[in-house]
Swiss-Prot record:
InterPro entries: Ald_DH/histidinol_DH, Ald_DH_C, Ald_DH_N, Aldehyde_DH_dom, G-glutamylP_reductase_CS, Glu-5-SA_DH, GPR_dom. It catalyses: L-glutamate 5-semialdehyde + phosphate + NADP(+) = L-glutamyl 5-phosphate + NADPH + H(+). This is Gamma-glutamyl phosphate reductase. Pathway: Amino-acid biosynthesis; L-proline biosynthesis; L-glutamate 5-semialdehyde from L-glutamate: step 2/2. Belongs to the gamma-glutamyl phosphate reductase family. SUPFAM superfamilies: ALDH-like. NCBIfam families: PRK00197.1 (NF001221), proA (TIGR00407). Keywords: Amino-acid biosynthesis, Cytoplasm, NADP, Oxidoreductase, Proline biosynthesis. Catalyzes the NADPH-dependent reduction of L-glutamate 5-phosphate into L-glutamate 5-semialdehyde and phosphate. The product spontaneously undergoes cyclization to form 1-pyrroline-5-carboxylate. GO terms for biological process: L-proline biosynthetic process. Its EC number is 1.2.1.41. It comes from Streptococcus pneumoniae (strain 70585).
Amino acid sequence: MVSRQEQFEQVQAVKKSINTASEEVKNQALLAMADHLVAATEEILAANALDMAAAKGKISDVMLDRLYLDADRIEAMARGIREVVALPDPIGEVLETSQLENGLVITKKRVAMGVIGIIYESRPNVTSDAAALTLKSGNAVVLRSGKDAYQTTHAIVTALKKGLETTTIHPNVIQLVEDTSRESSYAMMKAKGYLDLLIPRGGAGLINAVVENAIVPVIETGTGIVHVYVDKDADEDKALSIINNAKTSRPSVCNAMEILLVHENKAASILPRLDQMLVAERKEAGLEPIQFRLDSKASQFVSGQAAETQDFDTEFLDYVLAVKVVSSLEEAVAHIESHSTHHSDAIVTENAEAAAYFTDQVDSAAVYVNASTRFTDGGQFGLGCEMGISTQKLHARGPMGLKELTSYKYVVAGDGQIRE
């Protein structure tokens, strides 16, 4: 096993091969990575079977689905890499140019960060997404996967590096930390001088640990306590469709709805319909029904477990939905501000003034009017695959694509000027 220190030194030694690579060279490397990923399908599936067997009974079925790979999912990962090829190269982009009275010409240019560290949990697709995005944005990457997905991740990284071996980019620009202990995560948090940026992707425990302990600059990809508010002027059919998609299409992801707020004027009509759709109809279809966590007012209209205080501060990542009835738009916004992780929140309303108030007052990375929160995604936003959803305001916010993985520098051109 290569030590963490050796890996940090290896990636530092070769980072220039990617930091200054041309768009053509990077695109050739990405295509080679995608091809080798598909070619290694058999090896990756064998590794994934080991991870799945070890995880069964230890994590929920929803989380097992995040870990699971088949040939179609591997092909989708490769397709995601190829889609990055089609994205414009951000490196070298001129952001601003100005000329001073003394004749100096100042140009602000986009440049690579350098080396980016990614700490993430049991999501194999993050491995290929992170490698593709960092490479296209001119960065080397150090990956630290969760223990549950390590065998799968190792097989994926092996395939990606074999792809790089056929190009002029050194394969060591992608590093996988082999030690999955907590100490390896803390070592990355303290790797100042080796990592230029650290991005955690996972649950609240991981993200909080990184934010609280890292001395390396961090972009916080926050948890998703995502709200949908059904206003008194909502179209109920539209609301039900949005709720169904936001909660059930993929409950294990961070843009899935966790909290439903319903105006009291709508509760008596929409909540029984919601119960029919999310419980009765799903049972009839052989699907897992939604489990409700209900406040006292919501429990008057549907059956379910009484909500506890912490339910409105929980990212369930499962077929569980907390429901609260509110008396006004203002109460809904106040609730969101008290419980939000500033990820994605939505209002369903036909009232333009209510929509404007909601979008002005709710301080989240993505705020929706009459649309599912499941659109908070790099691909859906036209950014290609993403590095995560940033819930902070400094440097990057919302889905992080290529540009969010870059910095800039000033190039100052003169003709012998000196400062008086």
